[in-house]
Curated annotation (Swiss-Prot):
This is Protein TIC 214. Part of the Tic complex. Residues 243-291 are annotated as: Disordered. It is a multi-pass membrane protein. Involved in protein precursor import into chloroplasts. May be part of an intermediate translocation complex acting as a protein-conducting channel at the inner envelope. InterPro entries: TIC214. Keywords: Chloroplast, Membrane, Plastid, Plastid inner membrane, Protein transport, Transmembrane, Transmembrane helix, Transport. It comes from Morus indica (Mulberry). Residues 257-271 have a biased composition (Basic and acidic residues). The chain crosses the membrane at residues 18-38, 67-87, 90-110, 127-147, 175-195, 218-238. GO terms for cellular component: chloroplast inner membrane.
Length: 1879
C-alpha cells in the first residue's frame, strides 16, 4: 500500500509538473489564438476554394506561407521590442492599411468598379502569386480580429510576464497556433469535399458556375465590410474632430512633472490673467530636467493672444511672471509640423475615455497609469517578480548601476541567496533569544533584590538629535516610535525664516542640491537676452537675497562676505529699477565666486553638474474641455468663445423669462442693445427621460469602442453594460428574489396581535391605492411625452397640429356652438344669451407654454418651439351651458358638476385631438354634456307633477271617508265630552291648591340653597305614558283617576328623595376650580349657571302670586279649554281629536306638577345632555386607556387581588364620586391645548377663549367652596393634566413635558410604615415588576388617590413602594422578556407590534448590526420619546431580602466585542428625589420642527437624529454596543439612609453628542468624590481632545434658563463639527413639485401690469406656496431646515481609528467562537499592572478572554517582556525557521495541545487557548495595521483588499500554522482576508 501510494503520488506530481510546464501552457494559449478569426482568413479561404490547377496550387501554398509568416511575425513582436513598437503603434498600422486597401480595390476593379469577372486578368498576371502572399502577410499584421474578440490573442502577451523562459513559451505558443490552424484548414477541406460530392450541388452545373463567378465579388464585399469596421474602430485622421488646445507646453506637450519630495516649497504666485500655479516660483524649488524651457499659457486679453511667461527670478536668474503681448504669432505653419503630427494627433481622444476633471491640475489627467510595476525582488531568499514594486526604487537602482563603477554585476544563484537569507534569519533569531534569556535573568535578579521591575524591562529606543544636550525628536517625528505617537509630518519652508537653527536643519537635509542648481542657470543666460530690461520687486528681492547670504554663511562654515545686507541697498526706497541683465549676472557670479572657494582659493566647481531627481510623471491631456452645461451657463470665461467638446446628456433649455419681451409697449432702450450680454434669459435645463447614449464621451472619439450597452425597457433612463446588470436595482418583473416579501409577511405575522391593529387600515390602504394610481398615471404621462420627444419629426408635426387645433377651437368651433345654441333658444321661445356666451368666450385665453408647461406670453412662442416642443394652455376654458341664470330660475336645483373642478383648476391643456387635459400629456377629462342638465330638469319637473296629482287624489278620498264617519257619531261624541269635562271641573274645585303648591315651594327652597346641581348626572327624564283610549266605556270611573294620581305622587316622592340625597352629599363640600376675581366679564360657563338660578328666583316670587290666584287661574284655564274644544270639534277629524286629547292628558299632568322644580329639572336635563355629549369622547378615551393598559397577566400573583385587574372605568367612577373631580373640568383640560393655538377658532367668542385659556375655574367666586384638597388630589390632577392633550385614537398614557412624576409621588410615600415583613405581605412587588413602566406609575397614582385614607396592610390597598424610605419605583431589569435593547423596559409606546416588547436580544445573539426595521413605528403619531429614555435604574428594591453584591443587567452573552468604551466608576446615593432623568441626545425636548428625511423610514421624527447618527458611522455602533456601560460603585455609609453596596450598571445609549448633562452633575460628583473617593477610569478609543470634550459635557450641569441652554447648544454644535465636518444638504423630495409649481406661477406673474392683484388671487387659490417663498434676503440655514426646505444628512466618513479600535473591528467580527462572555464581567478587574506581584500582571489585550475568577488571565508568555517590535520579529523568525521548512515550527507556544501544561487550563478551555495562540501569533495588542504592512511589503500587494490566501502559498510554513490554529479554534479560513478588508 505504501509503495502504491508512493507511485501514485509521483504520478500526480509528474502530471502537475507537465501541465504547469512552459511548453504545455504555450501550446494551450497558442491553440486558443486560432479561434480569433480575422480578415486574413478570407484570403486564405479564397485561395483554397477558388483556385484550381497548377496555378491554384501555387496560390494555395503562397497564401498559407504568407499567413503563417505573418502570424510568426506577430509572435516574434511579442518578444522583440522594436518590432512590437513598429507593429503596435496605431499610426503605423493605419499607414500600412489605407494605401494597401486602395491598391487592392483598384487591382481587382481596374476596368469597372464593382464589376467582377472570373476570366478577366490584368497585365500584371505574373505577380499574382506574390500578391496573394502579400495579402495574407499584411492582413495578418493588421491585427484586426472579428470573432469572438481580440482578447484571445492578448492572452499570449499577458502570460509572457509570468514565465521565465520566454523564447520557449513563444515557440510553443506558435506551435500550438500552427496545430490549431492545420486542424482548421483540414476542417475546411472536408467541407469542400462534402460540397463537391453532394449530388444535388453537382447535378446543378449552372449553380456551380454562378457560385464560382460571384465568389470574388462576395470576398471583396466581405473584405470591404471588415475594413470599414476596422476604420470605424480607429477613425481616420482627416474626418475626426480637432480639439482646440488651450495650452501649448514647451516642456512636454502631454505630460507634466509632479515632483515627489518630502517638503512643499514655495508659494503660489497668482498673477493677473493666470490660472495655473507656477511650477517653479521660489528660490529652492525642484529643478526641471531642461531649465531652458519656459512655460507659456495662452489667455485672451482684449481679443489679442496674451502669453504669460515665467522667467527665472533673481537668485535663479529669473524674474517674476509678467504679461507680454506678442506682436507675432508663434503658431507653426502646417508644413513646418511633422507629417505624423498632421495625420495622427496622439493627444486626441482616440478612445472613448471620459474627461476626468481634477481640481489640483488645470488639465485632465490621462487615465492610463497602471498600478502595477513589475520588477524582481528578493523574498524568502529567492528572487521573485513583484508586480507592485515601487517605480522610484527601480529607477534609483538603475541609476546606481550606471553611475557606480564598483557595483558588482555578478548574480548570485538562488541557493546562495536562500542560504544567506536563512543564515541571517537564524542569527537574528539567536540574538533575540539570547536577549530574551538575559532579560529573564535580570528579572529574576530584580525580584530577588526587590528592585523595580520596570527598570529591567526593555525600553523603547528614541532618536536623539543632540547628544550633548540629550534632546530627542518629538514623538510625532520619531521614526522608532509607532502607533498613536506617530503622525503625519507636514514640513513647510518659508522664505521669511531667518533662524539659524532652522537653517541648519534644512542644510542637513540636502540644500546643497539646490545650490548646485544655481550653476545650471548661469550657462543659459544667453537665451533671455532678447529682453534686456526686467522689472524687479524690491521687497521680494531683498528678502530672498538676505536669506541667500545667510544660507551661504552657514554652508561655508564662516562668514565669507563682509556685506551687511541690512545696509546694502540694491534698489532705492519705494521705486522700481530696471537693471541690465549683464550687471545682474556679474553680481551674482561675484557672490558665487566669493563663497564657493576653498582656503587654497581653488574653485570647487567650475562647470554645472546636472543632478537627476526621481520624479513621477503624470500624463495630462493638453486640452481643457467643457460640456454643454458649462457652455450654457457660461461661467468659465474661456468657455465663452469655444464650443462644448463633451457630449453630455441630451437636454433642453426651458425658457422662463425673456428680457426682450418685458416691455410690452414696444419701447426699447438704446442702452439695452449695448448690454445684451448682461441681460441673459432666465431658463431651466430639462433632461429627457430617455437612454443616454452620449455618456459624456468627447467629440471625435471612437464611439464604436465603447462598452456594449443594452436597453430592455421602452423608456430607460440609463444605458447599462451587460456585465453590470446584476448590480443595478431590478425591476419588479425581473426580480427573482422571492424570499424578501415572504420574509416581511412572516415578520408581520409573527409580531402582530389583534389588540394592536391599526384602526385606519382601510383608509391607509385606500390612500396607498390612490398614490399608486397617481404614480401610474404620471408614468404613463411621462412615457407619452418621451415618445413625442424621441421621434425625429414628431415635435414639428405636433406643434403645428396644436396651433391649428387652438385656432379651430377659438375661432370656429366655439363661435359656431354659441350660434347654434342661441338659435335653438329662439326656436323654443326663450330669450337668447348672446351677451353671456360671448363674455365667457372672450374670457377663454390660449397661452403658449414650453414643453414642460411653463407658460409664456399670450402671443409669444417659445424659442425653438418646433424642435423642443410646445404646449397650449387654455385659461378659463369655455363651457357651453343651456342657461346662465340657473340659480334664480331653477331654485338651485341645477348644480354644475364642473363647478368644483373649475374652482380648483380653471385651466387645462390642449391635446392634439382637440381634447382637454389637466396636465400635459395627461388623459383627456370628461366633457360636460350640454343636454344633461336639461334632461335632469325635465325629470325633476315630471316627478313633482306626479306627486301633486297623487296627493290631491289621496286627500280627497280620505276626507270623504272622514266626513262620513264623523257625521254619524258627532252628536253622541259631543255629549260624552261635555259630561267628562264637568266631572273634571268638580274634582279640581274640591282640591286645596295651597297645599299642593306649598310642598313644591319647600322643595324648591332646598334646591336653591345648594346652587351647584349643574354638573350632576341625574337620570330623571320625563316618562311619557301612552295615551288613553278615549272611546273606552270605563273612562268615567273614579278608581282609574285615583290610580293615576297615586302613580304620579309616587314618582314625585322618589324624585324628591333623590334630590335630597344629592343635596346632602353636596353639603359636605366638593372641589370647585377657581375663577379669576379680577375679571370684569363673567365667563361663559358662569352665565350658563346664572340663567337657571335667576329662573328659580323668579319662579319663587311668582309662586306666592299663583297661590292666591290659583282658583281664578284654574277656572279661567278650564273655560278657555271648553271654548277651544267646541271651536275645534267642528273642524277637525277624529284623528286630530285623539291627538288633542293626548295633549290634554299631558297638560293635566303638567298642571298637577305646577312647580318651578320641574322647570329646574328640565333645565338640568338639558344641561346634562350637553355634558353627556361632550363626555362621550372622554368615555371613549377612557375605553382606549382601559384597552391599552389592561390584558396584563401576572403569573407570579399569589393572592386573588391584582390591581391590574381593576377596570379603569371603575377608577374614573370612583374619581367622579369623590370630591374635587368632575368631568367638565377634565374635558376643559383636554381642550386647553386646542385653544392655545393662535391660528384656529378665530371666530369664537371672547368669553369662551377666556374660559379655556384663563385659570381653571368653573363656578362663580361666590359659589366657590373653601375646602382645600389634600396632596393626593393635586397629585392626581397634575398627572391627568399631562394626558388630555393627546389626540391619539389608541394612545397610551405617556407623560408630557414638565412633569416629573417620580419626584412627585415620592412625597406621598409614607416613610413611617417600615414593616420588615412588607416583602411577604406585598405580593404586588413581584407582580408589578413585569408591568410596563408608564402603567405602573399610573396605577400607583390612581390607587393612591382613591384609597389614600386606607393605607393599611390589606393586600389590595397596600402600595408596593410605600414601605422603603428613600426608595424609587422598582423595575425588574433582569426579566426574561423581549425588550427593545433591554433598555425600554416595556414602556408603553403606542405603535408596538407586540404586547411585550420588540427584540429578544438574549435569544438572538447573532445580530451584528443595528437593524432599524425593529423600530416599526408610525410617522403619523408623534410620541414623547422621554418615556422610554428615562433610565431610572435600581437593583433589588427590597433591602431585607437576600442582597446580591453585583446586580448587573445581563443583556446578552456577547462574544468579546465591548472593549473600547468608557467606564465611569462613581459612588452615588440611592435617593430617588435627587436622581435626574438621563437625557439622551436632547430627546426630552419635543422636536416639533424636525424634518423627516425619508418618509419610508418606519419610525418617529424623533428617531431621525438616532438614524443620522447611525448613518454616520454604522460600523462604529453595532447592535449590542449602542449601550454605553456606566459602572457606578455605591458604597455603604451612614446610619439613617442605608445604602446598598455593589456596582449598579447603567446601560445608556452612546450618543455622538455625548449629552450626559442631566445625569451627571458637577456639584454632585465633586461632593461624592470628596466623601467616598471616586475612581474614574476611561478606557476608550477617543482621542485626547474628544475625551476632554466628553468629560466637560458629562460633568456640566444643565440649567433651565435660556441663556445656558443656548450656550450648551452652541458647544454641542461645535463639538459635532469637530468630529463630523462632512454633511450634505439636500432638497426635500416633496418640495420638488411645489417648487416647480411656484416657478410656473412666477413665470406668469413676471409680465402683468396689475401684479399685486393677480399675486393675491393666486395666493388665495393656493397656487403659490408662501412657505417656499424666500422673502428674506439672507436666509439662515436653521430656518431653511425648520421650514423643511433643506435637510442635513451626513456623509459617510473615512474615520481614522487607533490600533485598539482596528483590533476590535477585525477580531470582534471574525472570531466568532464558542466561549462567549457577558458584558457584566468586562470591567471588573482593578488595574493593568500590579507592581508588587509580577504574577498578577495583566496585559491590556488579554481582557478579551481572561478568566476572571482567577488572576491567571492568559497563557503566560515570556515574549511579552520584549518590546512589541522585537517580539514581532522573534515570532516571524520562528515561524520561518529554515531548519523546519517541512514541519511544524519548534515553538513552545505553537506546539500541540498535549505539550502545553499549565495549571490554568482544562479541557473546556481548548478553544480559548487556541484563540490565545492565534492572538500571540498575529501581533501583540492585535495591532493589525502591522499585519497590513506585512501584507504590503511581504506579499507584494499595494492594496490590502487584494490580499488572499493564495499568496500565502509562497510561505508554506506560515500557511500550515495558520490552518492548524484556525481549524482548532473553529474560525473560518478566510479570516485574514476578512480582517484586512475591515482595516
Amino acid at each position: 500500500m505504501i509503495f502504491q501510494s508512493f507511485i501514485l503520488g509521483n504520478l500526480v506530481s509528474l502530471c502537475m509538473k507537465i501541465i504547469n510546464s512552459v511548453v504545455v501552457v504555450g501550446l494551450y494559449y497558442g491553440f486558443l489564438t486560432t479561434f480569433s478569426i480575422g480578415p486574413s482568413y478570407l484570403f486564405l479561404l479564397r485561395a483554397r476554394v477558388m483556385e484550381e490547377g497548377e496555378e491554384g496550387t501555387e496560390k494555395k501554398v503562397s497564401a498559407t506561407t504568407g499567413f503563417i509568416t505573418g502570424q510568426l511575425m506577430m509572435f516574434i513582436s511579442i518578444y522583440y521590442a522594436p518590432l512590437h513598437l513598429a507593429l503596435g503603434r496605431p499610426h503605423t498600422i493605419t499607414v500600412l492599411a489605407l494605401p494597401y486597401l486602395l491598391f487592392h480595390f483598384f487591382w481587382n476593379n481596374h476596368k469597372h468598379f464593382f464589376d467582377y469577372g472570373s476570366t478577366n486578368r490584368n497585365s500584371m498576371r505574373n505577380l499574382s502569386i506574390q500578391c496573394v502572399f502579400l495579402n495574407n502577410l499584411i492582413f495578418q499584421l493588421f491585427n484586426h480580429f472579428i470573432l469572438p474578440s481580440s482578447m484571445l490573442v492578448r492572452l499570449v502577451n499577458i502570460y509572457m510576464f509570468r514565465c521565465n523562459n520566454k523564447m520557449l513559451f513563444v515557440t510553443s505558443s506558435f506551435v500550438g497556433w500552427l496545430i490549431g490552424h492545420i486542424l482548421f484548414m483540414k476542417w475546411v477541406g472536408l467541407v469542400l469535399v462534402w460540397i463537391q460530392q453532394n449530388n444535388s450541388i453537382r447535378s446543378n452545373k449552372y449553380l456551380m458556375s454562378e457560385l464560382r463567378n460571384f465568389m470574388v465579388r462576395i470576398f471583396s464585399i466581405l473584405l470591404f465590410i471588415t475594413c470599414v469596421y476596422y476604420l470605424g474602430r480607429i477613425p481616420s485622421p482627416i474626418l475626426t474632430k480637432k480639439l482646440k488646445e488651450t495650452e501649448e507646453r514647451g516642456e512636454s506637450e502631454e505630460e507634466r512633472d509632479v515632483e515627489k519630495t518630502s517638503e512643499t516649497k514655495g508659494t503660489k504666485q497668482e498673477q493677473e490673467g493666470s490660472t495655473e500655479e507656477d511650477p517653479s516660483p521660489s528660490l529652492f524649488s525642484e529643478e526641471k530636467e531642461d531649465p531652458e524651457k519656459i512655460d507659456f499659457k495662452e489667455t485672451r486679453y482684449k481679443n489679442k493672444p496674451v502669453y504669460e511667461t515665467y522667467y527665472l527670478d533673481v537668485d535663479r536668474n529669473q524674474e517674476n511672471s509678467k504679461l507680454e503681448i506678442f506682436k507675432e504669432k508663434k503658431e507653426l505653419l502646417w508644413f513646418e509640423k511633422p507629417l505624423v503630427t498632421i495625420l495622427f494627433d496622439y493627444k486626441r481622444w482616440n478612445r472613448p475615455f471620459r474627461y476626468i476633471k481634477n481640481d489640483k491640475f488645470e488639465n485632465a489627467v490621462k487615465n492610463e497609469m497602471s498600478q502595477y510595476f513589475f520588477h524582481t525582488c528578493e523574498s524568502d531568499g529567492k528572487k521573485r517578480i513583484s508586480f507592485t514594486y515601487p517605480p522610484s526604487l527601480s529607477t534609483f537602482f538603475e541609476m546606481i548601476q550606471r553611475k557606480m563603477s564598483l557595483f558588482t554585476t555578478d548574480k548570485l544563484y538562488s541557493d546562495e541567496l536562500y542560504n544567506n537569507w536563512s543564515y541571517t534569519n537564524e542569527q537574528k533569531r539567536k540574538n533575540l533569544n539570547n536577549k530574551l534569556i538575559n532579560i529573564i535573568k535580570d528579572l529574576d535578579k530584580a525580584l530577588d533584590s526587590k528592585f523595580l521591575i520596570l527598570d529591567v524591562l526593555e525600553k523603547r529606543p528614541r532618536l536623539c538629535h543632540d547628544n550633548t544636550k540629550k534632546k530627542y525628536l518629538p514623538k510625532v517625528y520619531d521614526p522608532f516610535l509607532n502607533g498613536a505617537y506617530r503622525g503625519q509630518i507636514k514640513k513647510r519652508f518659508s522664505l521669511s525664516i531667518k533662524d539659524k537653527v532652522s537653517i541648519q536643519n534644512y542644510i542637513e537635509r540636502g540644500w546643497i542640491n539646490k545650490i548646485h542648481g544655481l550653476f545650471l542657470i548661469i550657462n543659459y543666460l544667453e537665451f533671455e537676452e532678447k529682453k534686456p530690461f526686467h522689472r524687479i520687486d524690491k521687497r521680494l528681492l531683498s528678502t530672498e537675497m538676505n536669506f541667500f547670504l545667510n544660507l551661504i554663511n552657514e554652508f561655508n562654515g564662516k562668514p565669507t562676505s563682509s556685506l551687511n545686507f541690512k545696509k546694502f541697498y540694491l534698489l532705492p526706497e519705494h521705486k522700481q529699477l530696471r537693471i541690465n541683465l549683464e550687471g545682474r549676472e556679474k553680481k551674482i557670479r561675484f557672490l558665487f565666486e566669493r563663497f564657493l572657494t576653498d582656503p587654497n582659493n581653488k574653485t570647487i566647481r567650475k562647470q554645472a553638474i546636472g543632478i537627476k531627481e526621481i520624479r513621477k510623471k503624470i500624463p495630462q491631456w493638453s486640452y481643457k474641455l467643457i460640456d454643454d452645461l458649462e457652455q450654457e451657463e457660461g461661467e468659465n470665461e474661456e468657455a465663452l468663445g469655444t464650443d462644448s467638446q463633451i457630449r453630455s446628456r441630451k437636454c433642453k433649455r426651458v425658457l422662463i423669462f425673456n428680457h426682450e419681451l418685458e416691455n410690452t409697449n414696444g419701447y426699447s432702450n438704446s442702452q439695452d442693445t449695448n448690454n445684451n450680454d448682461e441681460r441673459d434669459d432666465i431658463a431651466l435645463i430639462r433632461y429627457s427621460q430617455q437612454s443616454d447614449f452620449r455618456r459624456d464621451i468627447i467629440k471625435g472619439s471612437m464611439r464604436a469602442q465603447r462598452r456594449k450597452t443594452v436597453i430592455w425597457k421602452t423608456f430607460q433612463a440609463n444605458v447599462h453594460s451587460l456585465p453590470f446588470l446584476d448590480r443595478i436595482d431590478k425591476d419588479v418583473y425581473f426580480s427573482f428574489d422571492m424570499l424578501r416579501p415572504i420574509k416581511k409577511k412572516f415578520q408581520h405575522w409573527l409580531w402582530k396581535k389583534p389588540e394592536f391593529k391599526i384602526s385606519d387600515y382601510r383608509e391607509k390602504k385606500s390612500k396607498d391605492k390612490k398614490k399608486e394610481e397617481e404614480k401610474r398615471r404620471e408614468n404613463a404621462r411621462i412615457e407619452i411625452a418621451e415618445t413625442w420627444d424621441s421621434i425625429v419629426v414628431a415635435q414639428v408635426i405636433r406643434g403645428f397640429v396644436l396651433v391649428i387645433q387652438s385656432i379651430l377651437r377659438k375661432y370656429i368651433i366655439l363661435p359656431s356652438l354659441i350660434i347654434v345654441k342661441n338659435i335653438g333658444r329662439i326656436l323654443l321661445f326663450q330669450f337668447p344669451e348672446w351677451s353671456e356666451d360671448v363674455k365667457d368666450w372672450k374670457r377663454e385665453v390660449h397661452v403658449n407654454c414650453t414643453y414642460n408647461g411653463v407658460q409664456l406670453a399670450e402671443k409669444e412662442f417659445p424659442k425653438n418651439w418646433l424642435i423642443d416642443g410646445i404646449q397650449i394652455k387654455i385659461l378659463f376654458p369655455f363651457r357651453l351651458k343651456p342657461w346662465h341664470k340657473s340659480k334664480l330660475k331653477l331654485r338651485n336645483n341645477y348644480k354644475d358638476p364642473m363647478k368644483k373642478k373649475e374652482q380648483q383648476n380653471d385651466f387645462c391643456f390642449l391635446t392634439v385631438w382637440g381634447m382637454e387635459t389637466e396636465l400635459p400629456f395627461g388623459s383627456p377629462r370628461k366633457q360636460l354634456s350640454f343636454f344633461e342638465p336639461i334632461f335632469k330638469e325635465l325629470k325633476k319637473r315630471l316627478i313633482k307633477l306626479k306627486k301633486k296629482c297623487f296627493r290631491i287624489l289621496i286627500i280627497l278620498k280620505e276626507r270623504t271617508k272622514l266626513f262620513l264617519n264623523v257625521s254619524k257619531e258627532r252628536k253622541k261624541w259631543v255629549i260624552k265630552n261635555i259630561v267628562f269635562l264637568k266631572k273634571i271641573i268638580k274634582e279640581l274645585s274640591k282640591m286645596n291648591p295651597i297645599l299642593l303648591v306649598g310642598l313644591r315651594e319647600i322643595e324648591l327652597y332646598e334646591l336653591s340653597e345648594s346652587k351647584k346641581e349643574k354638573n350632576l348626572i341625574i337620570d330623571n327624564e320625563l316618562i311619557h305614558e301612552p295615551s288613553i283610549n278615549i272611546q273606552s266605556t270605563n273612562w268615567t270611573t273614579f278608581s282609574l283617576t285615583k290610580k293615576k294620581i297615586q302613580d304620579l305622587t309616587n314618582r314625585t316622592n322618589t324624585t324628591i328623595n333623590q334630590i335630597q340625597k344629592i343635596s346632602k352629599d353636596n353639603k359636605k363640600g366638593f372641589l370647585s376650580p377657581h375663577i379669576n376675581i379680577s375679571s370684569n366679564k363673567m365667563s361663559y360657563n358662569d352665565k350658563r349657571l346664572e340663567l337657571p338660578k335667576n329662573i328659580l328666583q323668579l319662579l319663587k316670587r311668582r309662586n306666592v302670586r299663583l297661590i292666591r290666584k290659583s282658583n281664578y287661574f284654574i277656572k279661567f284655564f278650564i273655560e278657555r279649554i271648553y271654548r277651544n274644544i267646541f271651536l275645534f270639534i267642528s273642524n277637525i277629524p277624529k284623528i286630530n281629536a285623539q291627538l288633542f286629547f293626548y295633549f290634554f292628558e299631558s297638560l293635566k299632568k303638567i298642571v298637577n306638577k305646577t312647580s318651578s322644580y320641574n322647570n329646574y329639572i328640565y333645565n338640568n336635563e338639558r344641561n346634562q345632555e350637553k355634558i353627556d355629549k361632550t363626555n362621550q369622547k372622554i368615555t371613549q378615551f377612557i375605553s382606549t386607556i382601559k384597552e391599552s393598559l389592561s390584558n396584563i397577566n401576572n403569573k407570579n400573583l399569589e393572592t386573588f387581588c391584582n390591581l391590574s385587574y381593576l377596570s379603569q372605568a371603575y377608577v374614573f367612577y370612583k374619581l367622579s364620586q369623590s370630591r374635587g373631580f368632575n368631568f367638565f373640568n377634565l374635558y376643559k383640560l383636554r381642550l386647553r391645548s386646542v385653544f392655545q393655538y393662535n391660528g384656529a377658532f378665530l371666530f369664537l367668542k371672547n368669553e369662551i377663549k377666556d374660559y379655556f385659556l384663563g385659570t381653571q375655574k368653573i363656578f362663580h367666586s361666590e359659589l366657590r367652596h373653601k375646602n382645600i384638597p389634600n396632596y393626593e388630589i393635586n397629585q392626581w390632577k397634575n398627572c391627568l393634566r399631562g394626558y388630555y392633550q393627546n389626540n391619539l385614537s389608541q394612545s397610551r398614557l405617556v407623560p408630557q413635558k414638565g412633569i416629573n412624576i417620580v419626584n412627585q409621588h415620592s412625597i406621598a410615600q409614607n416613610n413611617h410604615l417600615n414593616k420588615y415583613d412588607s416583602y411577604e405581605k406585598n405580593p404586588l412587588i413581584n407582580s408589578e415588576k413585569k408591568n410596563v413602566k408608564k402603567k405602573y406609575r399610573y396605577d400607583l397614582l390612581s390607587y393612591n388617590f382613591i384609597n389614600y385614607e386606607d393605607k393599611k396592610n390589606s393586600s389590595i390597598y397596600g402600595l408596593p413602594l410605600q414601605v422603603n424610605n428613600n426608595q424609587e419605583i422598582f423595575y425588574n431589569y433582569t426579566e426574561h422578556k423581549r425588550k427593545l435593547f433591554n433598555m425600554l423596559v416595556g414602556i408603553p409606546i403606542n405603535n408596538y407590534l407586540v404586547e411585550d416588547n420588540i427584540i429578544d436580544i438574549k435569544n438572538n445573539p447573532d445580530r451584528k448590526n443595528f437593524d432599524w426595521i425593529i423600530l416599526n413605528f408610525c410617522l403619523r403619531k408623534k410620541m414623547d420619546i422621554r418615556a422610554w429614555i428615562n433610565m431610572d435604574t435600581d437593583a433589588n428594591s427590597n433591602k431585607y431580602t437576600k442582597p446580591r453584591a453585583n446586580n448587573y443587567q445581563i443583556i446578552d452573552k456577547i462574544d468579546n466585542k465591548d472593549l473600547f468604551y468608557p467606564t465611569i466608576h462613581q459612588n452615588q446615593e440611592m435617593n430617588p428625589s435627587k436622581k435626574k432623568l438621563f437625557d439622551w441626545m436632547r430627546m426630552n425636548e419635543e422636536i416639533l420642527s424636525c424634518p423627516i428625511s425619508n418618509l419610508e423610514l418606519w419610525f418617529f421624527p424623533e428617531f431621525l437624529i438616532l438614524y443620522t447618527s447611525y448613518k454616520i458611522k454604522p460600523w462604529y455602533i453595532p447592535i449590542k454596543f449602542l449601550l454605553l456601560n456606566l459602572n457606578v460603585n455605591e458604597n455603604a455609609s451612614g446610619n439613617k439612609n442605608k445604602k446598598t453596596t455593589g456596582k449598579k450598571k447603567r446601560d445608556i445609549f452612546i450618543s455622538i453628542f455625548s449629552n450626559e448633562k442631566k445625569y451627571l452633575e458637577l456639584e454632585k460628583q465633586n461632593q461624592v468624590e470628596k466623601e467616598y473617593g471616586i475612581k474614574t477610569d476611561f478606557e476608550s478609543t477617543l482621542s485626547n481632545q474628544e475625551k476632554d470634550i466628553e468629560e466637560n459635557y458629562a460633568v456640566s450641569k444643565m440649567k433651565k434658563n435660556k441663556k445656558q441652554s443656548r450656550t450648551n447648544m452652541e458647544a454641542e454644535f461645535d463639538f459635532l463639527l469637530k468630529r463630523y465636518l462632512l454633511f450634505q444638504l439636500r432638497w426635500d423630495d416633496s418640495l420638488n413639485k411645489k417648487m416647480i409649481d411656484n416657478i410656473k406661477v412666477y413665470c406668469s406673474l413676471l409680465r402683468p401690469i396689475n401684479l399685486r392683484e393677480i399675486t393675491i388671487a393666486s395666493i388665495q387659490r393656493g397656487e403659490i406656496n408662501l412657505d417656499l417663498l424666500m422673502i428674506q434676503k439672507n436666509f439662515i440655514l436653521t430656518e431653511l431646515i425648520k421650514k423643511g426646505i433643506l435637510l442635513i444628512e451626513p456623509v459617510r466618513l473615512s474615520r481614522k481609528n487607533e490600533g485598539q479600535f482596528i483590533m476590535y473591528q477585525t477580531i470582534g467580527i471574525s472570531l466568532v467562537h464558542k466561549s462567549k462572555h457577558t458584558i457584566n464581567q468586562r470591567y471588573r478587574e482593578k488595574g493593568l499592572v500590579d507592581t508588587k506581584n509580577f504574577d498578577e500582571f495583566i496585559s491590556k489585550h488579554q481582557k478579551m478572554t481572561e478568566n476572571r475568577d482567577k488572576n491567571h488571565y492568559d497563557l503566560f508568555v515570556p515574549e511579552t517582556i520584549l518590546s512589541p517590535r522585537h517580539r514581532r520579529e522573534l515570532r516571524i523568525l520562528i515561524c520561518f525557521n529554515s531548519r523546519n521548512r517541512n514541519g511544524i515550527p519548534s515553538n513552545a507556544f505553537f506546539c500541540n495541545e498535549n505539550k502545553v501544561k499549565s495549571p490554568v487550563l482544562n479541557k473546556s478551555k481548548i478553544n480559548q487557548n487556541n484563540i490565545i495562540r492565534l492572538k500571540f501569533f498575529l501581533w501583540p495588542n492585535y495591532r493589525l495595521e502591522d499585519f497590513a504592512c506585512m501584507n504590503r511589503y511581504w506579499f507584494d500587494t499595494n492594496n490590502g483588499s487584494r490580499f488572499s490566501m493564495v499568496r500565502i502559498h509562497m510561505y508554506p510554513q506560515f500557511k500550515n500554522e495558520l490552518k492548524r490554529v484556525l481549524k482548532k479554534s473553529e474560525i473560518r479560513i478566510d479570516f485574514i482576508s476578512r480582517t484586512i478588508l475591515h482595516i
